[in-house]
Amino acid sequence: ISSLFQMENRPKTLITHPALQRFLFNENAFVNRPALGILPPENFPDKLFESLLSIAPSGMSRVQTMACGSCSNENAFKSMFIWYRNKERGYASPSEQEVDTCMINQSPGCPDLSILSFMGAFHGRTMGCLAATHSKAIHKLDIPSFDWPIAPFPKLQYPLEEFVRENAQEEARCLEEVEDLIVKWRQKGRPVAGIVIEPIQAEGGDNHASPDFFSKLRNIARKHGCAFHVDEVQTGGGTTGKFWAHEHWGLDDPADVVSFSKKLLTGGYYHRDELLADKPYRIFNTWMGDPSKNLFLSEVLNVIRRENLLEEVTRSGKALLQGLYALQTQYPHILSRTRGQGTFCAIDTCNDATRDSIMLKARNKGLFMGSCGEKTIRFRPALVFKEYHVHQLLNILNDILAEHK
């Protein structure tokens, strides 16, 4: 699930880091974990600048730390709702009626706003995140949800160069549906406050779309006054060859909110100034993240820069994709739809039983792969994955596929 930055053991590198060394030998810092929302350490802002803010996405000047991907997205949704209502009120204080009705879960204090999400999405397992998740039924079953719009995510045909016209038509169809849903939900009295999307739908089957699709979707959000939330919980951290997958879109103004977790060691979300909560405690929980993780992240980022690991990912990713294409050509009755960015790659099998069999045999040979979607194998190596690792992977996979002839 793309949660590892580096898989090599680097205890000496980490433990000798001066800031981390001071932290490790300070028992008080371990035992008395600070409630960051009200009592952050004096140096906490400095540590944010050294870690999370040093890799902030384009246009993002603020970061809110959290603990995990779900609470990152859940609170990002809340930020978008608060921002939307503040706009509607003209940034005036809430009325007495709004304050009273919110206590009994009624409008106008609890407004009928919505978040637009996409089929195949996965954003988390808390209530709001589940309402925007449409890929794994087991997580949603028996849980009440919200009446929020769900748009189709493009289903691209591969190889891309052979289906340029068809894929452009498919993306146009999905974008048209997005606009129709925004208008429809506004007419229903449930206006769309925000749009949330993954740069690559991971759990849903490693589904991709073109930079043009995301650019036009960003414009639709702006046109209709919706916040645009890019969920980089799985794709962030460099595995696509860029630190943030949305950088591949080439946009100067890619998002209003970018959420993260997994590889970043801590959770949270970046946001524009205008999405800053207008009052204390509106975005709040007990811990609001963990300052120790910022120390670890700071050193991890130093290693990434020093060893040019994003360049390594680009080289290894190219070799991996080429190798998967070759296997697909050799075993067309088993494999199809090779795709990926960097080492964030995937390939489809002929059915789920075959996929599961291949993965089991691979695991028994020392190769651990993931599954997603209906019949997809996904590859999520760490950033230290080198070309010789690629060849080892491909050799093991080739041996297994030969047994399926």
Feature roles, as predicted:
Residues I1-K405:
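Conserved N-terminal phosphate-binding loop of PLP-dependent enzymes in the Aspartate aminotransferase
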